[in-house]
Curated annotation (Swiss-Prot):
This is Secreted RxLR effector protein PITG_15718. The lineage of its organism: Eukaryota, Sar, Stramenopiles, Oomycota, Peronosporales. InterPro entries: RXLR. Residues 1-20 form the signal peptide. It comes from Phytophthora infestans (strain T30-4). Transmembrane segments: none annotated. Keywords: Secreted, Signal, Virulence. The RxLR-dEER motif acts to carry the protein into the host cell cytoplasm through binding to cell surface phosphatidylinositol-3-phosphate. Induction: Expression is up-regulated during the infection stage of P.infestans with an increase to over 1900-fold when the sporangium and zoospore attach to plant tissue. High expression levels are then maintained throughout the infection phase.
Length: 154
């Protein structure tokens, strides 16, 4: 029983000293922050918007141009290089599969693919007779399965 009493006394001493140290450390941090706020008010730092978070110092904005969008998986440039390689190696099935991966990343809807495959100027019978029409139908099926019209640029 004496061991537990000794442990309780040691715990009480450690807790009281840690609280005393943390309160002095907190007041020191507050003085540093107030000096920083005097030099750089939060409204000036964040473009006129007061900021109460201290985790992020730079305001993040989304770009509409797509330059800074994070690409996950394969990037378009890698897929196009693979497609060119598959074309040179005469692998038509691989070329089509890679093309079906590139078009959604480029956010092309079936109308754009229809025009890209040069089916836009043809009458319906001639378009259906064209071997590229099967690719258009296959991509339309993939596009609709992935979300269709909700996937286009906003």
């Amino acid at each position: 029983m004496r061991r537990y009493a000794a442990l309780m006394v040691i715990d009480a001493v450690l807790l009281s000293t840690s609280q005393a140290l943390s309160s002095s450390h907190a007041s020191e941090l507050r003085s540093q922050l107030s000096a920083a706020d005097a030099m750089f008010p939060s409204a000036e730092r964040d473009g006129g918007i007061p900021n109460k978070r201290s985790l992020r110092r730079i305001s993040v904005t989304e770009s509409n141009d797509g330059e800074r969008d994070e690409e996950r998986g394969f990037q378009i440039s890698i897929l196009t290089k693979l497609q060119k390689w598959a074309t040179k190696m005469k692998l038509p099935k691989t070329t089509k599969n890679l093309q079906f991966r590139i078009w959604p990343k480029e956010k092309k809807d079936p109308k754009a693919v229809y025009a890209e495959l040069k089916l836009a100027g043809l009458d319906p019978k001639a378009a259906k007779a064209n071997p590229e029409f099967a690719d258009y139908l296959a991509y339309s099926k993939i596009w609709n399965h992935r979300g269709g019209r909700y996937m286009t640029r906003s």
